[in-house]
Amino acid sequence: MAPRRQRSGSGRRVLNEAKKVDNGNKATEDDSPPGKKMRTCQRKGPMAGGKDADRTKDNRDSVKTLLLKGKAPVDPECAAKLGKAHVYCEGDDVYDVMLNQTNLQFNNNKYYLIQLLEDDAQRNFSVWMRWGRVGKTGQHSLVTCSGDLNKAKEIFQKKFLDKTKNNWEDRENFEKVPGKYDMLQMDYAASTQDESKTKEEETLKPESQLDLRVQELLKLICNVQTMEEMMIEMKYDTKRAPLGKLTVAQIKAGYQSLKKIEDCIRAGQHGRALVEACNEFYTRIPHDFGLSIPPVIRTEKELSDKVKLLEALGDIEIALKLVKSERQGLEHPLDQHYRNLHCALRPLDHESNEFKVISQYLQSTHAPTHKDYTMTLLDVFEVEKEGEKEAFREDLPNRMLLWHGSRLSNWVGILSHGLRVAPPEAPITGYMFGKGIYFADMSSKSANYCFASRLKNTGLLLLSEVALGQCNELLEANPKAQGLLRGKHSTKGMGKMAPSPAHFITLNGSTVPLGPASDTGILNPEGYTLNYNEFIVYSPNQVRMRYLLKIQFNFLQLW
């Protein structure tokens, strides 16, 4: 139903109800004009938005398990209703919304959460609201409505209208209004489960039928906490927009905002237009900067980092849908995850010829400039991705076995969907040779993209058979490289050092460029010369995943 305009009397009624917060304290909303400080109300006892409640928690404590009843979890900060109520739904209408607003000029980076709650035990309704700076617990209000559902809807819809200048019933056509909050599009089909229930289910399942090495691999790549910790490191706010909840459309909108930022950087517009584009991006993709001013994205490196963030978000969305699906049945959860990958993973015998060749390839192509770690090969899995063999361009010559590295959080997406090219809406900046799939003939060059550390020293490297065909050889980066192919099939960025062709061997029909690396004599007379080769193809059907390596990174002591 359409929200009715509040008359003055009704407005006073809503205001009076808003004072009935669950701890008996009043709460003030952040409705002050930009650039002005919000007044703080005097309170008895702990402040709703006080020092203890408003303190940014340590990253290690930020990964929460949400208790889900229905399609959306009750905000864990709503102590009065947690475990006693659920978010009210009518069909596909879920009365739960997270709003976000970033304004760099005034150091605004804030959220507003609204939920209509229904008690589990009886038909009592309430409206929970919480607001504050991203990364902070903020302030809150709990409005009780007894059994009056229409009153609860009216409060919910009016607050949504006040904060966004959009009507709740028209939210499918939501349009951001300057100076108002934006609505984060959430995927209510992707839900987190109660961890204790999940563990209980796992104990009831039969034992996994998978090889123990495959089980350990799946535990490594399907670890939700690892995914959250990685996103927190990239400043993404997992509290305001939990992983698995952002829709594909919301991520796409983030790419569109980055495209605007790219246009500003290329045009040399570092004023208002760039700031507004950054405001839009941070509003669409929530970031936690604590009390710091959200930084303006000014350089291609900073833009590239945000592109990587969205790529990781996309892969994590895929991973969480796979991990959280199909809890029913008599299969062990790991067996279900494996089946949903549609990708066979067969561990190689450490004494086999394939394992020994791959181990030699790994160690002999560790680049001399990557001296801060060594790599130990723990396991190798032969990969057979469903449909890749049939689609692969066998007709193209010059097939090489090349390296590709990525964060642990990305591997469910890679194994289930294959290596992919960046979407059309992504900015081209950040891709040295355009939107393609990148490979190396030096193992450590790709290993650097695993982003391993001393505390998290396990990573995965992929060896793919790549149909390079005829390469277009370039001496320097060019984001428009795909347009320069002119009938050729791939791009090769020429490096100063590379494995010598004298050491190349053949494995299962593919050339393996064994090391060690030697000087190629390549020099770019017009500028920077790449240290090592890069190989880029622009179509997934030129790639066939062959081996997945589980690596231990051994970081050298700094003193």
UniProtKB/Swiss-Prot annotation:
Chain positions of motif Nuclear localization signal: 19-20, 33-39
Protein name: Poly [ADP-ribose] polymerase 2
Domain PARP catalytic: 332-559
Gene3D superfamilies: 3.90.228.10, Poly(ADP-ribose) polymerase, regulatory domain (1.20.142.10), WGR domain (2.20.140.10)
Tissue: Widely expressed; the highest levels were in testis followed by ovary. Expression is correlated with proliferation, with higher levels occurring during early fetal development and organogenesis and in the highly proliferative cell compartments of adult.
CDD domains named in the record: PARP2_NTR, parp_like, WGR_PARP2_like
Domain remarks: The N-terminal region (NTR) recognizes and binds poly-ADP-ribose chains produced by PARP1, leading to its recruitment to DNA damage sites.
SUPFAM superfamilies assigned: ADP-ribosylation (SSF56399), Domain of poly(ADP-ribose) polymerase (SSF47587), WGR domain-like (SSF142921)
EC category: transferase
SMART domains cross-referenced by the UniProt entry: WGR
N6-acetyllysine sites (modified residues): K36, K37
Main location: nucleus
Phosphoserine carried by residues: S208
Deletion phenotype: No visible phenotype in normal conditions, but mutant mice are sensitive to ionizing radiation. Following alkylating agent treatment, cells show increased post-replicative genomic instability, G2/M accumulation and chromosome missegregation accompanying kinetochore defects. Mice lacking both Parp1 and Parp2 are not viable and die at the onset of gastrulation. Female mice lacking both Parp1 and Parp2 in the uterus display infertility; defects are caused by decidualization failure and pregnancy loss.
Intracellular or extracellular location(s): Nucleus; Chromosome
